[in-house]
């Protein structure tokens, strides 16, 4: 008799995705982040659900409701900080997952990659709206600054901003709709992640060598289930350490001050995971130019398959490209640092140079390095 997991319509899908899935025998721990992102998403949806049971999306009571969750709800402080720091872990995994894709040429799976880029945008939108909900100073002013960027769009900009606000400023209508969107988007992200996996399983996983692994496949379970569980344990260990020892390490103290439209904080800045994009935005002394650079800083990922000039898929055997890749990583860390600094000398010029370098490496230097490496192969 055939095993039920191979015949039952529902269990067959799970079996073909997580149990009998043929996987390359040589994928490293850099391939763990897909499953870790799944764990992060489930964690965020669950903690978010319990937070939504006690949260009120009204400007008068939002801040108080978050205080109530932390003080009066059973383990409310734990749920709240797991959710806030879970977002940070989510983005750490996202950045490492995307970096892995860039390094090993995973972007050659075009459908999988493009859905991944859409997922990144959706996650960033969700995180931004979530940051507005506690209705602290940085929530309010962050929402004001970022939504205001849309006014840079010619002709329709101002109308668009007022339409999103639901009035002439960030107010009750804005908070209510942001809560609604923040609730629904993670489920859209989950659906997109399913499509992401669907397209990935059409081709099979890439591997560090960038070569076809069709001749050497192993079942996903038990090999990679066990390997993924180790990753999950490390993730949970880091997250619980963060939540229990320094829950406010990555937050902004200004967000413990209730939102006040009459008082602007000295330094308006987003959460740490947006600082690199924020630094690029601020580097251009023109509103529309800055917004375009901000969008392109992420959208540029969609153009990577077109910029791939190498004869090899992975960077494993391409030392010049490797060098440029790690310079790009250092550049992104520099941009993250600059994004959190005030707009004054020398930070302005450092940010501008780092922004130029970011686009130059991806658009010019990496394709050129690949061509050089192709020619070196002929020697």
Curated annotation (Swiss-Prot):
Cofactor: record remark: Binds 2 heme b groups non-covalently.
Membrane-traversing stretches: 33-53, 77-98, 113-133, 178-198, 226-246, 288-308, 320-340, 347-367
UniProt cross-references to InterPro entries, sorted A to Z: Cyt_b/b6_C (IPR005798), Cyt_b/b6_C_sf (IPR036150), Cyt_b/b6_N (IPR005797), Cytb/b6-like_sf (IPR027387), Cytochrome_b (IPR030689), Cytochrome_b_C_euk/bac (IPR048260), Cytochrome_b_N_euk/bac (IPR048259), Di-haem_cyt_TM (IPR016174)
CDD domains, sorted: cytochrome_b_C, Cytochrome_b_N
Keywords assigned by UniProt, alphabetized: Electron transport, Heme, Iron, Membrane, Metal-binding, Mitochondrion, Mitochondrion inner membrane, Respiratory chain, Transmembrane, Transmembrane helix, Transport, Ubiquinone
Swiss-Prot/TrEMBL GO biological process terms: mitochondrial electron transport, ubiquinol to cytochrome c
Domain of life: Eukaryota
Cellular location(s): Mitochondrion inner membrane
UniProt effect for mutating residue 102 to L: In strain: Isolate SNP-2
Record has Heme as a keyword: yes
Main location: mitochondrion
Cofactor names: heme b
Topology versus the membrane: Multi-pass membrane protein
Binding site for a ubiquinone: 201
GO cellular component terms, semicolon-separated: mitochondrial inner membrane; respiratory chain complex III
Binding site for heme b b566: 97, 196
Molecular-function annotations in GO: metal ion binding; ubiquinol-cytochrome-c reductase activity
Binding site for heme b b562: 83, 182
Pfam families in UniProt: Cytochrom_B_C (PF00032), Cytochrome_B (PF00033)
Something else known: Heme 1 (or BL or b562) is low-potential and absorbs at about 562 nm, and heme 2 (or BH or b566) is high-potential and absorbs at about 566 nm.
Annotated function: Component of the ubiquinol-cytochrome c reductase complex (complex III or cytochrome b-c1 complex) that is part of the mitochondrial respiratory chain. The b-c1 complex mediates electron transfer from ubiquinol to cytochrome c. Contributes to the generation of a proton gradient across the mitochondrial membrane that is then used for ATP synthesis.
Protein family according to the UniProt entry: Belongs to the cytochrome b family.
Subunit structure: The cytochrome bc1 complex contains 11 subunits: 3 respiratory subunits (MT-CYB, CYC1 and UQCRFS1), 2 core proteins (UQCRC1 and UQCRC2) and 6 low-molecular weight proteins (UQCRH/QCR6, UQCRB/QCR7, UQCRQ/QCR8, UQCR10/QCR9, UQCR11/QCR10 and a cleavage product of UQCRFS1). This cytochrome bc1 complex then forms a dimer.
Protein name: Cytochrome b
């Amino acid at each position: 008799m055939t095993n039920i997991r191979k015949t039952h319509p529902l269990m067959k899908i799970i079996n073909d995705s997580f149990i009998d899935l043929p996987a390359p025998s040589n994928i490293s721990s850099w391939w763990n982040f897909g499953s870790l992102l799944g764990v992060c998403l489930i964690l965020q949806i669950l903690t978010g659900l319990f937070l939504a049971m006690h949260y009120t999306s009204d400007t008068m009571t939002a801040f108080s409701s978050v205080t109530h969750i932390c003080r009066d709800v059973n383990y409310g402080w734990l749920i709240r900080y797991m959710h806030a720091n879970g977002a940070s872990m989510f983005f750490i995994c996202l950045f490492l997952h995307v970096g892995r894709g860039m390094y090993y040429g995973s972007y050659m799976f075009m459908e999988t990659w493009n859905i991944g880029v859409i997922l990144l945008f959706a996650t960033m939108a969700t995180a931004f709206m979530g940051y507005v909900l506690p209705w602290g100073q940085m929530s309010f002013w962050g929402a004001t600054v970022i939504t205001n960027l849309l006014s840079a769009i010619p002709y329709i900009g101002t109308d668009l901003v007022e339409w999103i606000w639901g009035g002439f400023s960030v107010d009750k209508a804005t908070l209510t709709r942001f809560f609604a969107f923040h609730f629904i988007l993670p489920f859209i992200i989950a659906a997109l992640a399913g499509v992401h996996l669907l397209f990935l399983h059409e081709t099979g996983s890439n591997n560090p060598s960038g070569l076809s692994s069709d001749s050497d496949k192993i079942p996903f379970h038990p090999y990679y289930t066990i390997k993924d569980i180790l990753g999950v344990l490390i993730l949970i260990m880091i997250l619980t350490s963060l939540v229990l020892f320094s829950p406010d390490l990555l937050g902004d103290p200004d967000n413990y001050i209730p939102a006040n439209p009459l008082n602007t904080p000295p330094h308006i800045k987003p959460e740490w995971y947006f600082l690199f994009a924020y630094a690029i935005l601020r580097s251009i002394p023109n509103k529309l130019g800055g917004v375009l650079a901000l969008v392109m800083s992420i959208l540029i990922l969609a153009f990577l398959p077109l910029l791939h000039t190498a004869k090899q898929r992975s960077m494993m055997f391409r030392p010049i490209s490797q060098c440029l890749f790690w310079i790009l990583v250092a550049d992104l860390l520099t941009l993250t640092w600059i994004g959190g600094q005030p707009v004054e000398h020398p930070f302005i010029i450092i940010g501008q140079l780092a922004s130029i370098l970011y686009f130059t490496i991806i658009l010019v230097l990496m394709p050129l390095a690949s061509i050089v490496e192709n020619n070196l192969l002929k020697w």
